[in-house]
Amino acid sequence: MNGAGDPSRPSDGANQSGFDLGGLPEAANKPYRVLARKYRPSSFEDLIGQEAMVRTVSNAFETGRIPQAWILTGVRGVGKTTTARILARALNYEKPDGSVKGPTIHMPDLGVHCQAIMESRHMDVLEMDAASHTGVDDVRQINDSVRYAPASARYKVYIIDEVHMLSTAAFNAFLKTLEEPPEHAKFVFATTEIRKVPITVLSRCQRFDLRRVEADVLMKHLGNIATKEGVEVEPEALGIIARAAEGSVRDSLSLFDQAIAHAAGHVKADAVRQMLGLADRTRVIDLFDSLARGDIAAAFAEFRAQYDVGADPVVVLSDLAEFVNFVTRVKFVPGTADNVAFGETERVRGRGFAAKLSTRVLSRMWQMLLKGIAEVQTATRPAAAA
């Protein structure tokens, strides 16, 4: 994610309960950090694709209507844990001169507690991974410690990741504390499985659903990072990475990191396709054209040619299905063809197919491809099944 934060791995301070109670920062000579960590947001302004959530939180802070607990849900890599740390930073933001008297979302500079909070080593911001600390004893420790005032910050903030992994007994032990916590305590929960969280817990929290980030937003974000890193990258390559990430910022940064290493600093679309095991987009469209014209011999020949150079039959069919979906969207929403996340060839030819193919044909192709993908995935000879 694009941001001013520059966190490092805490080298000390994790006690046996799973909480990080503070530790020493790393030495000045730091090893290489992956892009997902290097460009992790440190303020609400740095978050991308979550405007609705940021607006609600901003208004809550401005009006003083700050709840005792938040629960953040969404797919992997959209910023749940990062948002939790930013909330903790905003709650405890203080300047050395004492000019900030209460919680604020306006954090232009690093405050007294900011660095330690974003590095997950502040003694008043306690993080617990519920995936490895699922029992009632872990929650009892929170219940016992929450009564004590924070040591140095304004609030004691408990961040519990993957909260849906807590046991039923642990959730039940939490209810009273969660409903009536001390004024100095705040809770932030993060989960990818909101349906597994008991309604009794949800009713005590303010819920935010973090959305998948649109491909064009991811492309712009990756382009900004490429500029900062001094990396040359083709726009089409950014589009491929953005679509492959499926709305996950962390996934897009991980793939971009891998692409930079794969291409030795100059990221091209063909190199990214090779890295991801994708078929050449032009050849996928040629295969689609043969199928649309009913030229089965040409379609078989094109598929065999792609298979012979290493294309996975499942990937070829999935790419075909994705292109059918794109053409269908262009047919009903012509502006879809202006999305820069798709290559120029894909957009131009997509418009042409949308104009000449009927909805009935596109729908039939979509249904057949979905069935074909399912069959090929379980076939002993995928190429023959395709």
Question: What are the residue ranges of the model-derived segments?
Answer:
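P-loop/Walker A NTP-binding region and its immediately flanking N-terminal helices
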Residues: 1-207
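Extended, largely alpha-helical regulatory/partner-binding modules appended to the mid-to-C-terminal parts
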Residues: 21-23, 97, 106, 113, ...
